[in-house]
Amino acid sequence: MSMLKDPSQKYRPFSAINLPDRTWPSKTITEVPIWCSSDLRDGNQSLIEPMDAAKKMRFFKTLVQVGLKQIEVAFPSASDTDFNFVRELIEGNHIPDDVTIQVLTQAREDLITRTFESLRGAKKAIVHVYNATAPSFRRIVFNQDKQGVVDIATNAAKLIKKLAAEQPETQWSFQYSPEIFSSTELEFSVEVCNAVIDVWQPTPDNKIILNLPATVECATPNVYADQIEWFGRHVDKRDSVIISLHTHNDRGTGVAATELGLMAGADRVEGCLFGNGERTGNVDLVTLALNMYTQGLHPQLDFSDIDAVRKVVEECNQLPVHPRHPYVGDLVHTAFSGSHQDAIRKGFAQQKEDAIWEVPYLPIDPADIGRDYEAVIRVNSQSGKGGITFLLEQEYGISLPRRMQIEFSQVVQGETDRLGLEMTAQQIYSLLENEYLKATSPYVLASHRLQEENGTSAVDLEVSFDGEKQHWRGIGKGPLEALVAALPVKAEIMDYHEHAIGAGANAKAAAYIEIRLEGQRPLHGIGIDENITTASFRALFSALNRAVTQAEAKAA
């Protein structure tokens, strides 16, 4: 089957909203919305392998560090894993006083009751209830008329109000979502929400949240903005309602729809870091926040070390962030075009400290989000970079990780500029050897002994430091963590890759490590050995020696 010659026979365009006096096009975003992360709920449920409790806790703490004050942590009635995670957050006292957790429930009595059980003892909590309202869902999925949908919503609202009153020790907030809002008749969306408002009776001092999801993005962003502005004009008790946006990225315009929705009067945004979520993902909170930042409006979220945040997200979600992803991708601050590089270099030369940022091709100063300028200002050839990677893989079986490709290409580029000649595969490998494999000073790994028991690794190392013999010992959850613990300097592993070189009895292991010493930019190391543990240790020493050597050279 192929694309239809006349798609109008199968698909119908979305109907425009009749709003001739719309005001949002002339507005700008001047206030920061209430942010709510749905990484641990909407994001987690979309993963091939959902997070376990340890990963969820690590992610939760990262969200708190970033500055999120509302965090949707679970769907506690859906699984024991989610229920127990909520209990651990509360009983373990992991929730800061200025953070409110949010949980999701369907509009069913047993699920709502179970949800309140999970929240017992919480200081503050948002109970988020939803039911689908769109015509296709009413007709195809639930076989309900409009009144049936209203009854589901109001019955759930009544039960939530009753159960909340039975647990007065918690400061409750209520949230209702007419699921598939963006595909629901606007008049009916308001009818359902007004019915819920009538049950909950919010006030300006005790507001409720009405979350208006583009559960499936089905129109251009301006249509969503029209829907939000129309809704805001017609909903009851607008001064007692927080209008929340929850967009998805099915058409690739989730960020734009959210920004226009804020211009249309919304107060709050739900989304995920780097846009994880069902199908094409939820709106990316990082992109939204940094878009505001680059317009001079601080988002009240801290991405000063964006690579550290990305590391947590990638490891917990087990999904890589695309190298072209806005602000955080490996390549977003790198220009491969010579004319772009020339403009950037001239921009840096004229950019004065504390002046308005005007460097061409760079919408944000990489330093503001913890990035250095090495990848930005280097002289780089796209064909050279691709050729380096290809030759090393084909001739030597070495497959450099992406960030290491970028780092090593600078070494090769410097040599080609010096020589003014094309480099052969052998010359490139010699550069790799000298830069990484022969980085054996000031620390030389003489020997190591590894003991592993009950998930704990202990490593003893004999090391030569500038000719002086030393003994190091470290303990950790794995060999590398134990080795890092043994180091005489504070270091953090940012990335690790390994693969086999060759096959059979002559196979060797190649390990690549990216580390960051305190106060320095990340650097890579390579180790090759018949034993993978030894290879990884050699890689770490390679990176360590390079970092120490560069720090000494910089200080000299």
From Swiss-Prot:
Domain of life: Bacteria
Top EC category: transferase
Annotated localization: Cytoplasm
Catalytic activity: 3-methyl-2-oxobutanoate + acetyl-CoA + H2O = (2S)-2-isopropylmalate + CoA + H(+)
Annotated GO CC locations: cytoplasm
SMART domains: LeuA_dimer
Record keywords, A-Z: Amino-acid biosynthesis, Branched-chain amino acid biosynthesis, Cytoplasm, Leucine biosynthesis, Magnesium, Metal-binding, Transferase
InterPro entries linked to this entry: 2-isopropylmalate_synth_dimer, AIPM/Hcit_synth_CS, Aldolase_TIM, IPM_Synthase, LeuA-like_post-cat, LeuA_allosteric_dom_sf, LeuA_N_DRE-TIM, PYR_CT
GO molecular function, one term: magnesium ion binding
Segments for region (Regulatory domain): 439-556
Keyword Metal-binding: yes
Cofactor: Mg(2+)
Gene3D superfamilies the record matches: 3.30.160.270, Aldolase class I
Cystine pairings recorded for this chain: none
Pathway in which the depicted protein is active: Amino-acid biosynthesis; L-leucine biosynthesis; L-leucine from 3-methyl-2-oxobutanoate: step 1/4
UniProt record, GO biological process: L-leucine biosynthetic process
Domain Pyruvate carboxyltransferase: residue ranges: 33-307
Family: Belongs to the alpha-IPM synthase/homocitrate synthase family. LeuA type 2 subfamily.
Assembly and interaction partners: Homodimer.
Name the UniProt record assigns to this protein: 2-isopropylmalate synthase
